[in-house]
């Protein structure tokens, strides 16, 4: 079974496949408190349901399937029970999803750009992550992180974000596990071929960080999480660099690559 990585307590459309319910990092360890300064917690009145990535003081990138009404974003958070002094909360001022996205295909252009209602300040626990300067290389060791489930079957949400290292894999290693993947979906495949480390329910929208740059957005994967031969699927940020930069520059009519 394949699942979109959004919180399990949210309504998930019954499709032939679904995106990961806000998944937690399976097979990881508690993140160092200062290593996830760009990680954004997205929540509403029912609680946390997705993550995002701060790319500058006014903009956040997440997955399009994380779009929801009346959500807020928390910056600088670590423990959900103990506040950091520099935590900041913002509302979305504007949201941008690719105008040429095929709405009936959950994997197509799974990216959303959010303008904040006011800028956030850099601090000990808050800093933006750089957009990629070039495509990532197969074999790269990449970092995943999030407050998603840390167990693959029974949902177990941690108080703090978990992090893990995984490998960027060749598309050919993903195709057998995900025959529905098409080249036009512009995705990356990352994980451990033998399984054991993966994003999971609650991690949707969070970053895949390779060589210190923001290369992927948690989008899609298998359920249970962490299966062998079924790594996670991530939206390729590099392919949307021009769209992101155009929107930020004020060209709100910009379209995404086909």
Curated annotation (Swiss-Prot):
One of its GO terms (biological process) is proteolysis. InterPro entries: Peptidase_S1_PA (IPR009003), Peptidase_S1_PA_chymotrypsin (IPR043504), Peptidase_S1A (IPR001314), Trypsin_dom (IPR001254), TRYPSIN_HIS (IPR018114), TRYPSIN_SER (IPR033116). One of its GO terms (cellular component) is extracellular region. Its main location: secreted. Keywords: Disulfide bond, Glycoprotein, Hemostasis impairing toxin, Hydrolase, Protease, Secreted, Serine protease, Signal, Toxin, Zymogen. Residues 1-18 form the signal peptide. The active site is at 65 (charge relay system), 110 (charge relay system), 204 (charge relay system). Transmembrane segments: none annotated. It is an enzyme of class 3 (hydrolase). Pfam families: Trypsin. Disulfide bonds join 31-163, 50-66, 98-256, 142-210, 174-189, 200-225. GO terms for molecular function: serine-type endopeptidase activity; toxin activity. Its EC number is 3.4.21.-. It is found in: Secreted. Glycans are attached at residue 44. Residues 25-249 form the Peptidase S1 domain. Residues 19-24 form a propeptide. Expressed by the venom gland. Monomer. PANTHER family: KALLIKREIN-1, KALLIKREIN-RELATED. Belongs to the peptidase S1 family. Snake venom subfamily. Snake venom serine protease that may act in the hemostasis system of the prey. This is Snake venom serine protease 1. It comes from Craspedocephalus gramineus. The lineage of its organism: Eukaryota, Metazoa, Chordata, Craniata, Vertebrata. The gene is TLG1.
């Amino acid at each position: 079974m394949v699942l979109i990585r959004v919180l399990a307590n949210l309504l998930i459309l019954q499709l032939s496949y679904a995106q990961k319910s806000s998944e937690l990092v399976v097979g990881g360890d508690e993140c160092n408190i200062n290593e996830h300064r760009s990680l954004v917690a997205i929540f509403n009145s029912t609680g946390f349901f997705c993550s995002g990535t701060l790319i500058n003081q006014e903009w956040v990138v997440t997955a399009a399937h994380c779009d929801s009404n009346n959500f807020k974003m928390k910056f600088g958070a670590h423990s959900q029970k103990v506040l950091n002094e520099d935590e900041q909360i913002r509302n979305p001022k504007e949201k941008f999803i690719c105008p040429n996205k095929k709405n009936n295909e959950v994997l197509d252009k799974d990216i959303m750009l959010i303008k904040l209602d006011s800028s956030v300040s850099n601090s000990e626990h808050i800093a933006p992550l750089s957009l990629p300067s070039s495509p990532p290389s197969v074999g790269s060791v990449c970092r995943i992180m999030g407050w998603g489930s840390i167990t693959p079957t029974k949902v177990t949400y941690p108080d703090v974000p978990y992090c893990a290292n995984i490998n960027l894999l060749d598309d050919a290693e993903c195709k057998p596990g995900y025959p529905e993947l098409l080249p036009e979906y512009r995705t990356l495949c990352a994980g451990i071929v033998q399984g054991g480390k993966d994003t999971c329910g609650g991690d949707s929208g969070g970053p895949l960080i390779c060589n210190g740059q923001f290369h992927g957005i948690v989008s899609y994967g298998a359920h249970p999480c962490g299966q062998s031969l079924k790594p996670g699927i991530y939206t390729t940020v590099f392919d949307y660099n021009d769209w992101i930069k155009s929107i930020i520059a004020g060209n709100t009519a910009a379209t995404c690559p086909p």
